[in-house]
Amino acid sequence: MKKFKYILVAARAAVTLFSCKKDDDKPAPVPVPTPEAPKTVAEAKTDDKEKTYTVRLQNTTGTFVMGYNDLMLSVVDAAGKEVALEAATFTPWMNMFKGDGKGGFIKEVDFTHSCPHTPLAKEGNVWKSQALFQMKTGPSGVWFATITFKVAGKEYELKRLDFEVKPQPNKALGTVNRFKLFSGDKGQAHLYALVAPESPKAGENEIALGIWKMENTQSFPQVTNWVVEVKVSEKGSTAAISTATLRYERGFYRGKVTYPKAGEYTLSYTLKDAQGKAVQPQDNDKKDISIATTIQF
């Protein structure tokens, strides 16, 4: 009987040990990242007599930069409580000032232009947009937004919400650049910018390139039907260390390139139309140019 008790105790200990071992072998749960709280870039009261609502442009950093930006629209009441919007629009503008004839500018508006941006779209309870700011705020011009929205069937407007666009601090994205395509004497300006990855690594990276046609000062549709060949070379060299074909998908021209190590690289682009015919970028003087983005990480 005593022997049986010893066997039973040993068996229970083995089961307990095995159970603990099984629990220890289970992978630890992957922590779910907490979304970053939005930070206000700029805010102002609505234009109605009562100044009923405060309108805020927000993102995760609290700063707009020259280049591609995600943004959110928030509207709060006098108590600071966010209100539900039934509809909303966002249009960015830049006032360009007249020159003073001495290399500077005077605070008199010469003309106003917009920039590439997407219509506000509701995701859950958040209204979101993306904008490509092609210039930074400076002596030559300032940015502002016109915003409309509807609450409980009533429409409100904010004709001018001033905000600042700062220089792009992320060298991994390079800068916004432009080129022209000529048909006769009239040139059609285009903008292009690398929008991803924001944090490249040594090895393979998926890149995303945006190209926009400047139809006029208000309209900047994306070019979606080209093919872009990209060649990656190290600074000071023209030898290709990686090449890829970028095709339009998920909002941008995408493909994968390889960086052998952290450093400074030039991404040179060759453009082709839908029929495979070369598209030759030119400058304002109709001279053929090469287009590229220089990055560093």
Where is each model-derived feature located?
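Surface-exposed beta-loop interaction hotspot
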Residues: 136-205
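Aromatic sugar-binding surface patches on proteins
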Residues: 119-132, 247-255
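C-terminal motif of bacterial Sec signal peptides marking the signal peptidase cleavage site
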Residues: 16-19
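Short acidic/polar inter-strand loop motif in beta-rich domains
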Residues: 150-156, 272-281
